[in-house]
Design a protein with these regions (language model features):
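Common nucleic-acid-contacting/processivity interface regions adjacent to the catalytic cores
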Residues: 161-209
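Conserved DEDDh/DEDDy metal-dependent 3′-5′ exonuclease domain
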Residues: 41-139
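Intrinsically disordered or highly flexible coil/loop and linker segments, enriched in small
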Residues: 63, 67, 136, 156-157, ...
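Generic, well-ordered alpha-helical scaffold segments in large soluble proteins
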Residues: 57, 61, 78, 82, ...
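C-terminal or mid-to-C-terminal helical accessory/interaction module adjacent to the motor/catalytic core
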Residues: 133-134, 139-171
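Conserved RNase H-like, two-metal-ion catalytic cores of nucleic-acid enzymes
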Residues: 1-67
């Protein structure tokens, strides 16, 4: 199957912001959202059940490309570390890449950003795609919501420091929106995005610091 015919699956996570939602040592994952052109799915509940359910779902989906927004430095290593704390094996493979430049400090306990694949799915961090050209050319922030508004999309916005205060329905909608935006922004630039898909072997190292 040629790369351009593979489906794109947006992925986004939300973490418990009660203490520090940016530290995987203390903050559990409370929601994971997946988005494809034909569905939006949101996983909630106990963290161990979320991790297993997402992994099982990805294992059964047609091989494609997982699109994240800053997932190389946040979402994917966060999920990997939380799974390790539970003793859960995921089909998520990470490889640290020191060549990926970070604008902000790395995730707590990690050296930087990673290349990834999950089961038979490749990975693209769409944030790095847009930061590489759109950001410098237009001198705009490459935050997900900023880019979405720039191209005419309507993101759902909340106070990210108070994710734990959102209602069940609001959390579902917010997570699904972010996963959908990552997917759509990748699909809209697929001719270029295809070249940004991570290239690592399926049996690469599971890199959790």
């Amino acid at each position: 199957m040629r790369l351009h015919k593979r489906p794109v699956y947006g992925l986004d996570i939300e973490t418990d912001t009660t203490i520090d939602g940016l530290d995987p040592a203390v903050a559990p994952v409370i929601t994971v959202a997946l988005s494809n052109a034909s569905f939006d799915e949101v996983f909630t509940g106990r963290e161990d059940e979320i991790l297993c359910a997402v992994d099982d779902r990805l294992a059964t989906m047609e091989p494609g490309v997982i699109a994240t927004w800053n997932g190389a430095a946040f979402d994917l290593p966060f999920l990997a570390e939380r799974a390790a704390l539970h003793g859960i094996f995921l089909g998520l493979r990470l490889r640290y890449d020191r060549s990926i430049h970070l604008e902000h400090p790395p995730l707590a306990g990690h050296p930087g950003a990673y290349r990834a694949r999950w089961h038979d799915h490749g990975h693209i961090d769409a944030y790095r795609l847009y930061r590489g050209d759109v950001g410098p050319a237009l001198r705009v922030s490459c935050a997900l919501k900023s880019i979405a508004r720039l191209v005419g999309l309507a993101p759902i916005e909340v106070d990210r420091t108070k994710i734990h205060e959102l209602s069940h329905e609001a959390l579902h909608a917010y997570a699904a929106s972010d996963a959908r935006l990552a997917r759509v922004l990748t699909e809209r630039r697929w001719a270029t995005a295809a070249r940004f898909v991570d290239r690592i072997a399926p049996q690469g190292d599971a890199a959790v610091a």
